């Protein structure tokens, strides 16, 4: 009886757990056998650090077609983690898909997009000083999303897509557990259902106008999610109770990994999971998923703040490490509320090595949310560095029947 009561309390107060986490002994043994004392200590506390790791092995056949095998370590899609900026990946993909399906003459990702204010708390955007021409566009927002994980850029794509369109498209692609309910700005649930009017312009001429939208989509919020033991609310007052994440964005690690694969290898998965993108869209995404801040001229970034590995958790951000010129990470990370997440495709053009690696960890020793006291530097980034290095070193030695041709991912950066 005591055990049952304890289990019920765990489900209600912390994370809902309905099944055993998925773990492949191969991956667990590989990581543990090469782990430092620091990493072993983290791995021995799965309930504290809530880590999940997916390693995707890629083998090419004689036609260079990729074949994928996933290995899991403590992966549980029912265990909630806050996805933070990782939701920007599907949001960007839906924006490009929606543009292609609109099929309006003269309207593409490079066309000037003006955002109007149509409901309470909404803001308008009529200029963008980060772009070469000083005007906002879908393309410029996507650049900023992948280069430095810009929040306002995400908000503008969220508004262009509309909450309902975003979620219904993702669900139709099979991502039933994914939900994107909110901008990254202080708004309530009702305000996030309203999205702004949008205008696409060229030389002062209106090409297409999208009216304000209201989302009537129904979300399943029956599973209550509480994290921590205290939190600061929007008024910066300390509340001595767990923080409620029931209505927050959700993106399971397995879904994030599959979305990344579907973009980098569009013919590799089920047809229904593919995004309706053009060849130019794919090339554009590959460039800005892998480009480093110093390589960008528009936007131009202060490289002291936005250093090479600013968005590259696997396996470089710890210590603000420089990334070797022969290695590129095509990825999307997220960080918020003590959760760090990254899903990456790593390509080593010198050694002809490629693999995917995805992971999440929770580093919040004091259990207080929104206090900006998280162990990102001490524990989080070193976790990604060491796990990534272990997998990379294994890949360097792993025999391959066919050497991959990675030319599709070799990009000339401006």
Regions found by a protein language model. Give the residues of each.
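Bacterial Sec-dependent N-terminal signal peptides
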Residues: 1-25
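Structured C-terminal helix/loop/strand segments within mature extracytoplasmic catalytic/sensor domains
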Residues: 21-39, 45, 238-414
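Active-site-adjacent helix/loop patches that line small-molecule binding or acyl-intermediate pockets
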Residues: 22-36, 45-48, 117-118, 122-125, ...
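A short, well-structured edge-of-sheet supersecondary motif
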Residues: 33-75, 357-359
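Extracytoplasmic
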Residues: 46-50, 68-70, 76-78, 82-87, ...
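Acidic helix-start/capping segments at beta-turn-to-alpha-helix junctions
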Residues: 54-59, 106-126, 160-162, 183-192, ...
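Active-site-proximal beta-strand/loop segments in catalytic clefts of secreted hydrolases
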Residues: 56-58, 146-149, 157-160, 182-183, ...
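Active-site SXXK
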Residues: 81-108, 113, 357
């Amino acid at each position: 009886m005591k055990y049952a009561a304890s289990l019920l309390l765990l489900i209600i107060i912390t994370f809902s757990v309905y099944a055993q986490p998925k773990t492949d002994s191969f991956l667990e043994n590989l990581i543990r056998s090469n782990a430092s004392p620091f990493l072993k200590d983290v791995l021995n506390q799965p309930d504290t650090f809530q880590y999940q790791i997916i390693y995707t092995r890629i083998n090419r056949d004689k036609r260079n077609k990729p074949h994928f095998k996933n290995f899991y370590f403590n992966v549980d899609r029912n265990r909630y983690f806050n996805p933070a900026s990782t939701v920007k990946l599907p949001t960007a993909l839906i924006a490009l898909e929606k543009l292609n399906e609109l099929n309006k003459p003269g309207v593409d990702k490079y066309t000037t997009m003006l955002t109007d204010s149509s409901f309470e708390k909404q803001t308008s955007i009529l200029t963008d000083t980060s772009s070469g021409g000083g005007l906002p566009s879908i393309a410029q927002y996507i650049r900023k999303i992948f280069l430095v994980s810009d929040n306002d850029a995400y908000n503008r794509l969220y508004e262009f897509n509309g909450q309902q369109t975003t979620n219904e498209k993702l669900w139709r692609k099979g991502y039933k557990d994914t939900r994107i309910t909110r901008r990254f700005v202080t708004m309530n649930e009702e305000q996030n259902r309203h999205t702004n009017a949008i205008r696409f312009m060229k030389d002062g001429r209106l090409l297409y106008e999208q009216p304000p939208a209201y989302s009537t989509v129904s979300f399943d919020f029956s599973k209550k999610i509480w994290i921590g033991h205290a939190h600061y609310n929007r008024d910066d007052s300390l509340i001595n109770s767990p923080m409620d994440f029931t209505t927050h964005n959700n993106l399971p690690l397995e879904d994030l990994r599959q979305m990344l694969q579907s973009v980098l290898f569009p013919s590799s998965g089920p047809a229904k999971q593919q995004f309706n993108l053009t060849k130019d869209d794919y090339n554009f995404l590959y460039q800005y998923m892998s480009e480093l801040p110093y390589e960008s001229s528009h936007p131009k970034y202060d490289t002291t703040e936005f250093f090479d590995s600013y968005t590259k958790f696997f396996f470089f951000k710890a210590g603000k490490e420089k990334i070797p010129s022969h290695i590129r990470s095509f990825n999307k990370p997220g960080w918020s509320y003590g959760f760090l997440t990254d899903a990456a495709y790593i390509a080593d053009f010198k050694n002809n090595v490629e693999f995917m690696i995805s992971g999440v960890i929770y580093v919040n020793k004091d259990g207080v949310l929104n206090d900006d006291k998280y162990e990102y530097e001490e524990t989080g980034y070193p976790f990604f560095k060491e796990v990534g290095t272990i997998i990379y070193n294994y890949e360097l030695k792993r025999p391959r029947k066919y050497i991959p041709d990675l030319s599709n991912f070799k990009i000339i950066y401006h």
